[in-house]
Amino acid sequence: MNFNLIDINHWSRKPYFEHYLNNVKCTYSMTANIEITDLLYEIKLKNIKFYPTLIYMIATVVNNHKEFRICFDHKGSLGYWDSMNPSYTIFHKENETFSSIWTEYNKSFLRFYSDYLDDIKNYGNIMKFTPKSNEPDNTFSVSSIPWVSFTGFNLNVYNEGTYLIPIFTAGKYFKQENKIFIPISIQVHHAICDGYHASRFINEMQELAFSFQEWLENK
């Protein structure tokens, strides 16, 4: 997958990037509830699992916007991937650990869903941190905490402050006033994403949840 270098000196975001990367190293998270009432009803009728559906939605928004695909490569050069693949957690009740498995993103939901099922079949019961080898560099993290409907979530990433890729976490969905919601948290680096960009992610997730008929059976 192609990694496109960013010319920082001619980048409109340069002063913001340098400020939040070097002067005030800053990451932040935003949590919001996404209504999934009709979506959940529809996928249950079709016997479709919810978790890969949610992962697909997140990956679709990520791949629709360059700011969610910006990072440093292994040489330390800044750039962005043409596309990114989700790496998601699978819980093992037997020993209370989890695995991180990646599936290649596909714009077709049905193809992505099929690939997800194959990966779960092949690797889901292997109790290793990363049971599927050869994870590409162009992945982003998705995790699920389906035991609690949290109202806020924050990860403390201890490094040099150079991890720029967003991290996504979903909680337990819940019912409120005859509607069903799920809390979604996005954690981003302020050098790359402002409140506008994080808000756009939340809003587009909601749009996908409402417009599921346009993509749920997309081949």
Swiss-Prot record:
Q: Which domain of life is it from?
A: Bacteria
**Catalytic activity entry:** chloramphenicol + acetyl-CoA = chloramphenicol 3-acetate + CoA
Q: Which Pfam families match?
A: CAT
- InterPro entries, per this entry? CAT-like_dom_sf, Chloramphenicol_AcTrfase_AS, Cmp_AcTrfase
- Name the Gene3D superfamilies for this protein: Chloramphenicol acetyltransferase-like domain
Q: Which residues form the active site?
A: 190
The alphabetized UniProt keywords are: Acyltransferase, Antibiotic resistance, Transferase
| Protein family (similarity comment) | Belongs to the chloramphenicol acetyltransferase family.
Q: How does it assemble?
A: Homotrimer.
UniProt-recorded name of the protein: Chloramphenicol acetyltransferase
